[in-house]
Every structure is written in C-alpha cells, then in structure tokens.
C-alpha cells in the first residue's frame, strides 16, 4: 500500500498572493471532502516559511504539521479522538519522505491514534477509535532534505486516502491481533512484528505512552 504519491513540480508563487490566500482562510471552516482537498492542493509548491504565520517552524518535531493545521486550514491542532475535520470525517496527516538511490521511501511511521486500553477492548473494528478517526485521511507529503531549513520545504502532493478492500482486510486483521492481546491482559507483549500494516508502538517519554 503506497502512501507516497508522485511528486509535482514546485510552482513559484509571489508573496503577495500567498498573503491574500492566508488571509482568506481566517474564519473559514472546511466541512466537505471536496473543499478540504481543494484547499490542500493550493499549498503545493509554496515554501513553508511563506505559510507559517505563527513561528511554528522553529518549535521542533511535528512543527510542519502544526503549520499546515494552524496557518493553512485555520484550526487549532488537537489530539482528540475526533478526525481533524469532523464534519467531513477526514483526518489530516502531514508526512515526510526520503529520496535515495533506490527510489522514494517513507522517512518515518505514520502515527494514527492513541490506543485507549480502557475503552477499546470491547469495541469492534468498525466502532474503534482508529476507524472513526482514520477511515479517510488527507495525506500531505513533502521531501525531507537534511541540508535545508524547514522553511524551504514545500508540500508536493495532497491526496485523500480511503483503504482499498484488499488492504482493509489486512488492517482489520492487524487491529484484531492487537486487541486480542489487550483483551487477554497481554498488552505488554505487543510488538510491531505481530502485524503487517497496523502496528502498536510506543510514542512519548516512555513505553507507557502507546499509539497505533
């Protein structure tokens, strides 16, 4: 299941045009998949320094995603169980890739949601927090360039992703594998080697912070 799409050629946009676009997003709410995707496509090729209105690029890991959320779509980032665009049921994911001699590959895992052991154990896949939050994702990609400042980075593709049936069957099986260990009190035994697409991994200050 390829998550990185073909790169588009960066376009040159004058600063004054960018400023008008950024001003236009204030007070705007994106409530349909079509309007969300259209807005996402409009950022392609624009240097992120021209998008960042709040200085987020200097704040460290995750800053690029926050810039897109705050300065481009005009909403406050959150880590709640709802999708980023709840009316449309769309979750935003901004992800880097690397270009090497063997082609393009993802730079890092795509973190989907927090596993709440106290709530998820009695749910089905279709009623799970993962499915509620991530069944449709807006994936925005950029090339990670180690020798360039983040302000030079540009979003080069934006696509709406819904899982194909053949992949969805594997993802559902992976979810059931993870939850079976949770239900039987073996959550501490969870390993990324248990599954194919969907994995349980620690993310945070220590191993007690677990995400899917």
Task: Identify the meaning behind each predicted range.
Residues 2-86, 91-212:
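Nucleic-acid endonuclease domains
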């Amino acid at each position: 299941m390829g998550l990185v799409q073909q790169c588009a050629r960066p376009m040159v946009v004058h600063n004054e045009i960018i400023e008008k676009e950024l001003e236009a997003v204030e007070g705007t709410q994106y409530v349909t998949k079509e309007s969300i995707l259209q807005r996402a496509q409009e950022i392609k090729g624009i240097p992120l320094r021209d998008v960042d209105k709040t200085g987020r690029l200097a704040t460290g890991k995750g800053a690029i995603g926050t810039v897109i959320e705050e300065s481009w779509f005009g909403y406050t980032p959150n880590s709640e169980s709802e999708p980023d665009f709840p009316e449309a049921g769309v979750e935003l994911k901004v992800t880097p890739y690397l270009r090497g001699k063997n082609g393009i590959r993802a730079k890092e895992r795509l973190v989907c949601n927090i596993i709440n052991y106290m709530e998820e154990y009695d749910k089905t896949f279709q009623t799970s927090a993962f499915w509620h939050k991530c069944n449709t994702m807006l994936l925005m990609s950029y090339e990670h360039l180690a020798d360039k400042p983040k302000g030079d980075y540009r979003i080069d593709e934006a696509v709406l992703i819904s899982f194909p049936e053949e992949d969805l069957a594997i993802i559902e099986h992976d979810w059931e594998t993870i939850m079976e260990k949770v239900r039987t009190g073996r959550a501490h035994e969870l390993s990324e080697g248990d599954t194919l697409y969907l994995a349980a991994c620690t993310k945070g200050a220590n191993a007690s912070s677990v995400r899917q």
